[in-house]
C-alpha cells in the first residue's frame, strides 16, 4: 500500500487505452466505459483526478510525418488534435455518468474546450471535478509525456501515473525484444536518465525531477487505476532515496 496519503494525482493515459485494436473502431465503447468507471472509483476515494490523454489510437504525429511525407510541425499538430477528440469523448462519457469535469485544451479551441489555465484547473480539482487536459504540451516536437509532466508540475500533484498498454513498468532493456529484460521496482530520476531508458520521454523525467514529483509507470492492461494509485505495481521513478510508493 502507499506510504503516504495521496490527495491529487495526474494520469497520463495512452490513446491506445481507448481502442480495441480494430482500425475501424478508434474509440471502443468497452474501453471507454472501463476508463470512466475506474476514474469514478479513484475520485470516490477522495482523490483529486487530472488526466492527460494521448491520441495514438487516432493518429501519431511522428509516424504520420514519416509515412505520408507531412512536415513534422503539421503532423504533430494533427496528433494534438487527436488528443482533443479523445478528450471530448471522455468528457461526454463522464457527463453521462454525472461526474463533474472540466475539458481543457492547451491551444485555443473555445467552441470545443476551455483554454487550459493552471489556476482554474487547480480550482476545478479542489471542487471535485475531473480535469481533462488535451493538446499535449501545445507545441510540436514535444511528447504527451512532456505535456503530462508540465501539467503535473503546474497542478502540484502528488504523483504522475503513466498508464501503458504494452509493458508493466521500466525495464533495463526492451522486454518486447529481450526475454531476459529485468523490471525495476524503483529507479532514481538520475539513473533513468544516465541509462538512456526509453520508456518515458527524458524531458518529462527532468521536469518531474526538478519539481520532486514521483512518476509511476504501470500496465493498464493488467492493473486498474485504483491499483495504480494505492498499491505497489509497476515502476516508481523518484529521488534516489524515494523507494517504491
From Swiss-Prot:
The keyword Secreted does not apply. The keyword Protein biosynthesis does not apply. GO terms for molecular function: ATP binding; UMP kinase activity. It comes from the Bacteria. One of its GO terms (biological process) is 'de novo' CTP biosynthetic process. ATP binds at residues 12-15, 56, 60, 164, 171, 174. Its main location: cytoplasm. Its EC number is 2.7.4.22. Homohexamer. Catalyzes the reversible phosphorylation of UMP to UDP. This is Uridylate kinase.
Amino acid at each position: 500500500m502507499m506510504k503516504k496519503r495521496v490527495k491529487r494525482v495526474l494520469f497520463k493515459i495512452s490513446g491506445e487505452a481507448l481502442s480495441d485494436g480494430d482500425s475501424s473502431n478508434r474509440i471502443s465503447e468497452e474501453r471507454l466505459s472501463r476508463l470512466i468507471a475506474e476514474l469514478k472509483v479513484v475520485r470516490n476515494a477522495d482523490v483529486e483526478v487530472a488526466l492527460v490523454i494521448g491520441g495514438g489510437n487516432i493518429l501519431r504525429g511522428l509516424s504520420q510525418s514519416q509515412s505520408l511525407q507531412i512536415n513534422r510541425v503539421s503532423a504533430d499538430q494533427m496528433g494534438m488534435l487527436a488528443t482533443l477528440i479523445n478528450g471530448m469523448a471522455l468528457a461526454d462519457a463522464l457527463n453521462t455518468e454525472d461526474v463533474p469535469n472540466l475539458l481543457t485544451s492547451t491551444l485555443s479551441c473555445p467552441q470545443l474546450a476551455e483554454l487550459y489555465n493552471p489556476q482554474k484547473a487547480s480550482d476545478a480539482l479542489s471542487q471535485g471535478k475531473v480535469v481533462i487536459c488535451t493538446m499535449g504540451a501545445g507545441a510540436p516536437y514535444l511528447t504527451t509525456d512532456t505535456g503530462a509532466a508540465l501539467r503535473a508540475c503546474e497542478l502540484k500533484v502528488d504523483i504522475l501515473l503513466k498508464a501503458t498498454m504494452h509493458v508493466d513498468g521500466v525495464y533495463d532493456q526492451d522486454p518486447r525484444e529481450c526475454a531476459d529484460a529485468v523490471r525495476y521496482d524503483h529507479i532514481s530520476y538520475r539513473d533513468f536518465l544516465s541509462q538512456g531508458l526509453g520508456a518515458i520521454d527524458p524531458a518529462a523525467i527532468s521536469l518531474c525531477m526538478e519539481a520532486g514529483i514521483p512518476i509511476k509507470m504501470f500496465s493498464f492492461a493488467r492493473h486498474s487505476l485504483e491499483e495504480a494509485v494505492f498499491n505497489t505495481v509497476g515502476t516508481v521513478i523518484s529521488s534516489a532515496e524515494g523507494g517504491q510508493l
